[in-house]
Amino acid sequence: MHTLSNLLSSIKNAQKAQKRVLYFSSFKKISKRKKRFVCSACKMMPRVFVSRLCWDFCRILYNEGYIHGFSQEADGSLRIVLKYHSSGIGVIKKMKTISKPGFRIYSSKNRLSKKREGLGITILSTSKGNLICDREAQKTNFGGGEILCQVF
């Protein structure tokens, strides 16, 4: 969950700074107890632990039309190309983390509410460890899961 929070905040900050491309790569283990995120010299490209959770999250954002694309680079980093309107405003207006490590929120597919007249999406975690959006959950025979975040 911390990985997803880092990814959400990095995307928010990149859109505020109107960056087109983000690069995410794994962090280095400094010692047994400390883990630090390795940043580039200019500190413009945040680096976050790349996991299947990040990959699935980017896949959902791409399928729903919130980003232009994403790919894995040769060094193992994740490259995300953000999408902007012609006026220069980011397509993603708001990203909100719902479930937190200390306070998990679960819901069934019938109880998922439509925020902002259905313009946003809610991202859920299934019992198999996959991420799906609320539209996929209502189309398939999905029982319920943990609500991770909402994207508008």
Curated annotation (Swiss-Prot):
Name of this chain's protein:
Small ribosomal subunit protein uS8m
One term of GO molecular function: structural constituent of ribosome
Mention any one GO cellular component term assigned to this protein in its UniProt record.
Answer: ribonucleoprotein complex
What are the protein's UniProt keywords?
Mitochondrion, Ribonucleoprotein, Ribosomal protein
Return the InterPro entries for the record: Ribosomal_uS8, Ribosomal_uS8_sf
Q: Name one GO biological process term.
A: translation
List localization entries.
Mitochondrion
Please report which protein family the annotation says this sequence is part of. Belongs to the universal ribosomal protein uS8 family.
The question of whether Ribonucleoprotein is a record keyword is answered with yes
PANTHER family associated with the record = 40S RIBOSOMAL PROTEIN S15A
